[in-house]
Amino acid sequence: MNPPAWPASRLFQPVDTVQTLELPRNELLETAMTNSGMQLAGGGVHRTKDIKPEDLVGRGIQLNSYQPPTTRLKPERVFQLAGGSRSSFNPSINTLLTLQPAASVPRSGGIGEVQFVHEFVPSVYFQPFSGPPGSYPDEFIYNFDVATDSIDGYA
């Protein structure tokens, strides 16, 4: 059920194209975008002249409802939405954000929580692991029988 490497064609994913956005380095505009919870992808309702929601595709990438500290914005021309480290910040550098919702290379190891819910029946094994999806083991339920919708040896 869970091989060491999942080919990209076997994963449940939307068919979308890659979009690259040039993010503004205007702090006032960024603060306004952040405070209003503007979605960079996912079809959120937000009206501006430069960025139109209908031109954006993707899932779940958005600015938080609070203003992130500038230490989480890295100057290497990569805009990190989460998990940034402390670094210097140069607001004059234009930052690019690449939206690529569909996988282009095979994934290895676990399949993540969303794909896990699609693959396994929640009534049999609803929340088998705690912690972030990256900490899941490679093999989830080695003795799960698809034909009988049960786990072998589990009463």
From Swiss-Prot:
One of its GO terms (molecular function) is hexon binding. One of its GO terms (cellular component) is host cell nucleus. InterPro entries: Adeno_PVIII. Pfam families: Adeno_PVIII. Induction: Expressed in the late phase of the viral replicative cycle. Cleaved by the viral protease during virion maturation. May cause the middle segment to be shed from the capsid. The keyword Phosphoprotein applies. Keywords: Capsid protein, Host nucleus, Late protein, Phosphoprotein, Virion. Residues 44-84 form a propeptide. Interacts with the peripentonal hexons as well as the hexons in the facets. Part of a complex composed of the core-capsid bridging protein, the endosome lysis protein VI and the hexon-linking protein VIII; these interactions bridge the virus core to the capsid. All late proteins expressed from the major late promoter are produced by alternative splicing and alternative polyadenylation of the same gene giving rise to non-overlapping ORFs. A leader sequence is present in the N-terminus of all these mRNAs and is recognized by the viral shutoff protein to provide expression although conventional translation via ribosome scanning from the cap has been shut off in the host cell. Belongs to the adenoviridae hexon-linking protein family. This is Pre-hexon-linking protein VIII. It comes from Bovine adenovirus 2 (BAdV-2). The lineage of its organism: Viruses, Varidnaviria, Bamfordvirae, Preplasmiviricota, Tectiliviricetes. The gene is L4.
